[in-house]
Amino acid sequence: MDALTLLTTRKSNKKLTAPAPNAEQLERIFEAAMRAPDHGKLHPYHFIVMENESLNKLETLLKAAVVEFDLGEEKLMKAENLAHRAPMVIGVVAKIDPTIAKVPGWEQMLSAGCATYGLQLAAQAQGFDNVWISGKWVNGTALREAFGCREQDRVIALVMIGTGMEKAERECRVIDTKDFVTYL
């Protein structure tokens, strides 16, 4: 699949199973992610790979966030499901350095977001479906500690990666660009 087709047909797929990327494929995914736009060459992000037994640890961390934020019993069950939705989960932390005036925090956050998107595209290009998960639970104290976050850092994604149980339909809904583009 050429790059433009990949970009214009990418879709999330929440129904994932094994296999996940192997070590060589994962290395390529990270190489692609680290080519994200990055003013100041800061690489303001960190990736945490979870698979096998560490998915049980993720479940514990997500459940702790549900309790911490009093999100209720339904979210507690969702946390259990979420941690085991895919054979591999990659946590993404935006590592923000507020002391760099030349590259403000918002710009560092954008770079981390672009790296996450690059990670998704590289996985998709190698035949792996994925979905970017976020929400209040990524702000849980236990999860942030496990991911090595400093106060200024933000967990911006839990990217679930695996093989689609059902192939995500490549026909994406048509988006009229006129609603989003203005020419001066």
Curated annotation (Swiss-Prot):
Annotated source species: Haemophilus influenzae (strain ATCC 51907 / DSM 11121 / KW20 / Rd)
Pfam families to which the protein is assigned, alphabetical: Nitroreductase (PF00881)
InterPro entries: NAD(P)H_nitroreductase (IPR052530), Nitroreductase (IPR029479), Nitroreductase-like (IPR000415), YdjA-like (IPR026021)
EC supergroup of this enzyme: oxidoreductase
CDD domains in the cross-refs: YdjA-like
Similarity section: Belongs to the nitroreductase family.
CC cofactor note: Binds 1 FMN per subunit.
E.C. designation(s): 1.-.-.-
Entry binding sites for NAD(+): 122-127
Subunit field text: Homodimer.
NCBIfam families (alphabetical): PRK10828.1
MF terms in GO: oxidoreductase activity
Cofactor requirements of the protein: FMN
Residues reported to bind FMN: 10-12, 35, 39, 132-134
Protein's recorded name: Putative NAD(P)H nitroreductase HI_1542
Cited PANTHER family: NAD(P)H NITROREDUCTASE YDJA-RELATED
Keywords: Flavoprotein, FMN, NAD, NADP, Oxidoreductase
